[in-house]
C-alpha cells in the first residue's frame, strides 16, 4: 500500500493587494514504505512548500494528501505528531531549542510514541553520537552534530514517513553525505518512507530509489534514479543534468539555467517550461501536458 499519496496538489500563497501565487500547481507524487524519493529543482520551484503541506504546516488550496490512506491536512501540531510524519528542517541551528538539553528534546518524541524502552542516549548512539551528549545544550555542537540530533529527535517519535527539507544544505561538505546516508539507512531500516529534498544532485543520486523533478510548482518527471540519470526525458531534467560541470553527472544544481524563470504569479500558458525549452512546439504554448511520468508533449502517451 502506498504510504504517502499526493494527488493534484495546489498550494497558494496570498498577500493583501497582490495576486495569489501558486507555489504548488497540481503536483502528484507517491512514497512507498521503505522507499527514498528525492525531490529536486531550482530554488523557488515549490519543493519546500510541498513538504510543509505534507506535514500540515501549509494549508492546501486544492487536491489531496493522504498518509496511509487517511487525509493529513489540515493538521495542528498535535495531530501531525499522531500521524507518524516527522520533518527534519534545513537549519539545524534554528530547529533545536537552545535552552534545553538535547536529551530532553529527544525525550519529547519518545513520550509522543509511548516508548519507555528507549532512552535519548540510545537514539544519539543510533545517529553516531556519544551517549553523554544527552546532557549538553545545542550551542556546544557543530552543524553536522546538531543535524544528527535533529534526526534523533525525529526518529524518537517512530515516524512512518520522514521528510528532509534541504537537511544538508547548511552543513559543510564533509558532513553532507554522511548525514544524508544516515537518514536513508535509518528510514529504510525502520521501514519508513523518506522524502528527501535537496539541491545536491550527487547526494540524491546516491541515496534515492526514485527521483522527482519539480519546475514552477509542477512535477515534470518521475522515475527510477538510475534511469533518469542515464536517460533524462523531460527537457528541464536534461538541462539540469547538462548544466552540472562534473563529467560524471554528479554535483550541485546550478544557480541558474539559461533563460529567465517565469513569475509564479503569472506563469506562461501551456507547458510552464516552454519559454526556456529548446524543443518548444505550438502545442507546448497552447496546452499544458497533464500526464506522467514525463509531463512533456514530446513524450505524450500513445
Residue ranges with predicted function:
Residues 16-18, 71-86, 104, 112, ...:
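ABC ATPase NBD coupling module
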Residues 137-141, 145:
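Conserved ABC ATPase signature
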Residues 156-160:
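A short, proline-enriched helix->beta-strand linker immediately N-terminal to the Walker B motif
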Residues 117-132, 241-242:
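Conserved ABC ATPase "signature" region
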Residues 170-252:
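P-loop NTP-binding/switch modules centered on Walker-like glycine-rich loops
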Residues 62-73:
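Conserved ABC transporter NBD signature motif
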Residues 78, 222-302:
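Short catalytic/signature loops enriched in Gly
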Amino acid at each position: 500500500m502506498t504510504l504517502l499519496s499526493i494527488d493534484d496538489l495546489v498550494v497558494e500563497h496570498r498577500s493583501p493587494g497582490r495576486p495569489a501565487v501558486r507555489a504548488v500547481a497540481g503536483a502528484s507524487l507517491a512514497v512507498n514504505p521503505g522507499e527514498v524519493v528525492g525531490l529536486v529543482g531550482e530554488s523557488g520551484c515549490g519543493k519546500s512548500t510541498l513538504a510543509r503541506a505534507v506535514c500540515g504546516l501549509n494549508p492546501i488550496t486544492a487536491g489531496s494528501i493522504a498518509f496511509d490512506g487517511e487525509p493529513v491536512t489540515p493538521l495542528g501540531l498535535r495531530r501531525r505528531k499522531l500521524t507518524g510524519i516527522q520533518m527534519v528542517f534545513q537549519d539545524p541551528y534554528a530547529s533545536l531549542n537552545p535552552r534545553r538539553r538535547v536529551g530532553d528534546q529527544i525525550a519529547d518524541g519518545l513520550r509522543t510514541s509511548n516508548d519507555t524502552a528507549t532512552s535519548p542516549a540510545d537514539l544519539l548512539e543510533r545517529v553516531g553520537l556519544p551517549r553523554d551528549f544527552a546532557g549538553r545544550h545545542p550551542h556546544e555542537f557543530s552543524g553536522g552534530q546538531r543535524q544528527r540530533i535533529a534526526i534523533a529527535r525525529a526518529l524518537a517519535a517512530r515516524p512512518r514517513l520522514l521528510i528532509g527539507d534541504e537537511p544538508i544544505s547548511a552543513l559543510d561538505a564533509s558532513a553532507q553525505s554522511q548525514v544524508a546516508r544516515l537518514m536513508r539507512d535509518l528510514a529504510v531500516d525502520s521501514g519508513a518512507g523518506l522524502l528527501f529534498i535537496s539541491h545536491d544532485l550527487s547526494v540524491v543520486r546516491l541515496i534515492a530509489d526514485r527521483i522527482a523533478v519539480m519546475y514552477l510548482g509542477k512535477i515534470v518527471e518521475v522515475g527510477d534514479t538510475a534511469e533518469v540519470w542515464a536517460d533524462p526525458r523531460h527537457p528541464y531534467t536534461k538541462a539540469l543534468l547538462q548544466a552540472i560541470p562534473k563529467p560524471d553527472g554528479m554535483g550541485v544544481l546550478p544557480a541558474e539555467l539559461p533563460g529567465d524563470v517565469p513569475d509564479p504569479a503569472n506563469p506562461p500558458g501551456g507547458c510552464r517550461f516552454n519559454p526556456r525549452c529548446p524543443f518548444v512546439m505550438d502545442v507546448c504554448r497552447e496546452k499544458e501536458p497533464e500526464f506522467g511520468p514525463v509531463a512533456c508533449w514530446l513524450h505524450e502517451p500513445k
